[in-house]
């Protein structure tokens, strides 16, 4: 498994970021390739994802550790992905958002397409960074 960690500082209080993070139906606004998210009972979500010209549905289980400011998730089928988003208050009006993603490069390429090797790692890093920047914009603008 490969691991990627990225963070961004957002200019809103931690509770606002936490609430935005849990409005999964808004993910298509800031997560590239996510076309639709449907939340289900029991902490499950179905994501319709478009990658490399193909549309695919992924199912994920999501769990919270609100007291610690952590939301964790993992896919329940292929490709095997897992990650977390941790929130840390910088002060009363700013929050650090730390994203962690663990993935199998071969499984990602097989399921979603895209480049191999370092090119794949760089593409995923750019994608996560871009998604965090879009999340920041959405949260700070109250969208």
Describe the residue ranges of each PLM region.
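Short, surface-exposed coil-to-beta transition loops
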Residues: 3-5, 55-59, 80-84, 96
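Beta-strand/loop substructures that line and gate deep hydrophobic ligand-binding cavities in soluble
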Residues: 74-130, 137
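Hydrophobic ligand-binding cavity/cleft-lining segments
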Residues: 1-44, 134-137
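Helix-adjacent hinge/juxtasegments
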Residues: 58-66, 71-77, 83
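Short, hydrophobic/aromatic-rich segments at coil-to-beta transitions
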Residues: 39-46, 65-73, 141
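Flexible glycine-/small-residue-rich
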Residues: 47-49, 89
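Hydrophobic-ligand-binding modules of eukaryotic lipid transfer/binding families
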Residues: 1-9, 47, 123, 129, ...
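Short beta-strand micro-motifs enriched in acidic
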Residues: 40, 63-65, 86-90
């Amino acid at each position: 498994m490969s691991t990627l960690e990225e963070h961004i500082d957002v200019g809103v209080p931690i509770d606002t970021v936490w609430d935005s993070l849990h409005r999964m139906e808004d993910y298509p606004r800031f997560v590239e390739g996510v076309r639709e998210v449907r939340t289900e009972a029991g902490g499950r979500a179905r994501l319709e994802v478009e990658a490399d010209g193909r549309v695919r549905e992924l199912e994920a289980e999501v769990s919270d550790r609100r007291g610690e400011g952590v939301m964790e998730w993992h896919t329940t089928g292929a490709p095997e992905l897992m990650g977390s988003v941790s929130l840390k208050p910088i002060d009363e009006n700013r929050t650090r958002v730390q994203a962690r993603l663990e993935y199998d490069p071969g499984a990602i390429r097989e399921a979603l397409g895209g480049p191999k090797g370092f090119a794949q790692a760089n593409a995923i890093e750019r994608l996560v960074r871009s998604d965090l920047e879009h999340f920041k914009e959405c949260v700070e603008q109250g969208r």
